[in-house]
Each structure stands twice: as structure tokens, then as C-alpha cells.
Amino acid sequence: MAYLDHAATTPMHPAAIEAMAAVQRTIGNASSLHTSGRSARRRIEEARELIADKLGARPSEVIFTAGGTESDNLAVKGIYWARRDAEPHRRRIVTTEVEHHAVLDSVNWLVEHEGAHVTWLPTAADGSVSATALREALQSHDDVALVSVMWANNEVGTILPIAEMSVVAMEFGVPMHSDAIQAVGQLPLDFGASGLSAMSVAGHKFGGPPGVGALLLRRDVTCVPLMHGGGQERDIRSGTPDVASAVGMATAAQIAVDGLEENSARLRLLRDRLVEGVLAEIDDVCLNGADDPMRLAGNAHFTFRGCEGDALLMLLDANGIECSTGSACTAGVAQPSHVLIAMGVDAASARGSLRLSLGHTSVEADVDAALEVLPGAVARARRAALAAAGASR
């Protein structure tokens, strides 16, 4: 089997599994005052310190959550509510149409239920957005509560100009959040230097366990909690913390960040070999997303015209190649990718797209296997699409 779906989830690092298992053999609520509780508290604070160190944050800025979706919801809704409460005229969110649904659906929920307004930044054909467009949006509206722009796109791998955009947001006094879930372990991140107010990360995207993430939140940024209870995590995210998962995520973060330069160079070579092979061996195919250096090292996203992505996906799966038609959070939904549509791709082409994403366990044999199977699978999927089109007439 060749696993080419690292953008959906990554295999856990063995060291992260071992670190989690060691904690799971112990007991103790990190909020308890007895010996076991203090031991649990020490472990989670050490995990917090390690994650902060690797991502350029202060330990007090790391708020543990149950994953990337919660982190995005907490940032978008919580910061919006806080800004609106402090300045009632601020009811606008500026974001992009290529965000993950955790951000998009949070924004749309605020529009539908809280009377929020939204300004969508224009998307270029390669999936990028510009700091100039953000400046124009903020100059046009004095009611902006929050800017939210992802650091790197989860489908096509385009890296967005977060440093430049955060400077613009700061100039206008507007807090900015970034979904950096795809960026950890693939790009050098420094939360403190980024100028961001908040940043979302998820453990399972860089070799940690699923079900745990973090929101990095500056101390001077107010965020209304989604949940109420024991007041853990700066009274922003109540609930008994999952110490083992936090430790596993911290261990994975250390491995991913410390090995980032070497791993990115290795993945870039594998990805380029994959891209060159696909473009050479298959007709009527295009690579979606930005070129280097504004593309994640492990991402290759193609449109195979004349076939359905889901059909192609299943043909590949039957031959031992595991990949995706897009975000795993929307897989199985018979709709073209909202990211590709925002990039100007027509619906039919968008439905014929595949994402092949590499990660820390990827090797040359995975690329070889994909290149061996893909041409035949594409040809078969195209024949099936032609037959289906003929039968429907």
C-alpha cells in the first residue's frame, strides 16, 4: 500500500506513541492537588512549554483543544464575540473562500445566527490571496472585528502571505487569526514574530495523535469561550485536559520542527518526481496550486479532465494507492471542491481532481507505485465517464 494522504492525517511518530503510552499508564487529573494530580499537571505544562518553544510562542499562549476544528471555531467565534461586545459596531469578518470548512462554517454560522457580515478576499487562479486585497477591504470597512486567513491551503498546498497580511491587520488595529494546521512541520512558524493574534494547530497533521490540537492566543487578545465549566486553559477552554494526547502532540511537534529542513527537502524531491511523472505520462492533466516556493513541499494536486475524481480514487484504492479528492472533512460529498471553484476552476474539472500528499513516512517506492498505477486508472475512469455520458443521452 502507498499512503499518499498525509494532508488528511499523518501516521503517528513512534516516539509520540511511546510518550502517550507512558502517560496512559499513570493516573491523575491535572486540576487535582494531590501527588498524582500534580504529576499530571507537570506533564501537561511540560508539553505546553515544548509546543510553545517549537512554534515561537509563550507557554501561556498555548491553549489545548480537542483538535483543529475546535481551535478554528474558538478563534473565529470567540474573538468575534469579544470584539463585538467591546465595540458593538464591529460585526464584520474578513476571510477567504479557500478556508477549511471549520473556518467557513463558523463564519457562516455567525452570519446566520449573530448578524455578522463577511467580506471575502478575492482568490487568484493559484489559490493565493494578497495583502493588497486585505488592505483594500480594511480601508473600505471600519466595522471589522476579525481577519481569518489560513497559512497554507489543505487542498492545493498554496502558501499564503501571512507575514505581510498580519502587518496590514495590525496597522488597522484588527486581530488576525490563521489556520496553520497544514503548515506545522512543513514551514518554519514563529507565532511571536508573525504578528498574529491567534493561530490554530492540530496534532494529527504532524505525526501526533488525532483528537488534540491547540489555539495559540496572545495574552492581550480577548476570546469568549465556547464551553464553560472548570475554567481550565485560561478560562477559555474548560474541561479536564487530555494529558496523554497533549504529551503525544508535543513530542510529535519537537520531531517535526527539529527535522523540518531535512524532511521538507526530501519531500520536495519526491513531490517533484511525482508531478513530473504524472505530467509526462498522462494527457490533459493540470497541476493546481502555486509554484515553489509558495507551495507546501508534500502537496501535489491534479485535475484529470474527463473523469470523476471519486471513481478515480476508488480505482487507485483497489490498486493499493491511497489518496484523496480533497479535504477529508468533505470526502464523500458529491460536490466540487469549494477551493477549486474559488480559484476559477469549472465544476466539471473540479470534480475530476485528486490530491496526493506526502509526509514523514513517504519513500520513493510510494511515488513509483503511484506512477505505475495512475495512467491506467485515469484511462479507465475516462472510459467509464464517456460510457456514462453516452448512456444518459
From Swiss-Prot:
One of its GO terms (biological process) is iron-sulfur cluster assembly. Disruption phenotype: Cells lacking this gene are microaerophilic and hypersensitive to oxidative stress. Moreover, they show impaired Fe-S cluster-dependent enzyme activity. [2Fe-2S] cluster binds at residue 329. Keywords: Aminotransferase, Iron, Iron-sulfur, Metal-binding, Pyridoxal phosphate, Transferase. Its cofactor is pyridoxal 5'-phosphate. Pyridoxal 5'-phosphate binds at residues 68-69, 154, 182, 202-204, 240. GO terms for molecular function: cysteine desulfurase activity; iron-sulfur cluster binding; metal ion binding; transaminase activity. Its EC number is 2.8.1.7. The modification N6-(pyridoxal phosphate)lysine is found at residue 205. SUPFAM superfamilies: PLP-dependent transferases. Belongs to the class-V pyridoxal-phosphate-dependent aminotransferase family. NifS/IscS subfamily. This is IscS-like cysteine desulfurase. It comes from Mycobacterium tuberculosis (strain ATCC 25618 / H37Rv).
